[in-house]
Amino acid sequence: NPDSKALIIGADIAKYGLNTPGEVTQGGGAVAMLVSANPKLLSFEGGSTYLSRNIMDFWRPLGHSEALVDGKYSSNVYLDFFNNVYSNYKDKTGFTIDNFEALLFHLPYTKMGLKALREAQKDADAKVSAKLTHRFEDSRLYNRQVGNLYTGSLYLSLLSLLENNDDLKSGDRLGLFSYGSGAQGEFFAML
């Protein structure tokens, strides 16, 4: 039914063992969004690029309450997936970094998104780079307070940007990178 609204909920708990490298990144929470055919706040621009591979960088074995992770490898996979889907998105749409007013990321920890942003900024002039960095800082404020939400972290970043940035305008294009270890990645835009 195209006139219906849908409630989308992303909830998870990121729990790691005591004194493990992942302990400092753990968190828990949920993000809920109302999606409709006639949005009042943001709309999907249409089209995305995505990548999926079977990669054992992060997993929770059956019967275990805590995840296992190869942190450095997982970080490298994240950046590889971002570079792949972002590059493919630019090729597909003809956009450059100049077409985005902000880039938002899945944030297992906030430095990870900064690393991906720096990858994207390799093609940016100083003014665009400064704008994107400023908006990234606005987008990661809540993630720094809450910790890793897993499935909800990208949308917590979006909420943080919208609530903490005062210079975005209606119709500004936001680029979003969604990611999940194991691994899947998607890049899409919202207006």
Language model features: what each stretch is:
Residues 1, 107-191:
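Claisen-condensing/thiolase-fold acyl-transfer catalytic domains that form or cleave C-C bonds
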Residues 6-12, 34-35, 106, 176-179:
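Short beta-strand segments
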Residues 9-10, 53-67, 108-114, 144:
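Acyl-CoA/ACP chain-elongation machinery
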Residues 15, 20-80, 183-191:
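Condensing-enzyme catalytic core mediating Claisen C-C bond formation in acyl metabolism
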Residues 19-23, 68-74, 101, 136-149, ...:
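Cysteine-centered functional microenvironments
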Residues 83-101, 161-167:
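Phosphate/pyrophosphate-binding loops at sites that engage ATP/ADP/AMP, CoA/4′-phosphopantetheine
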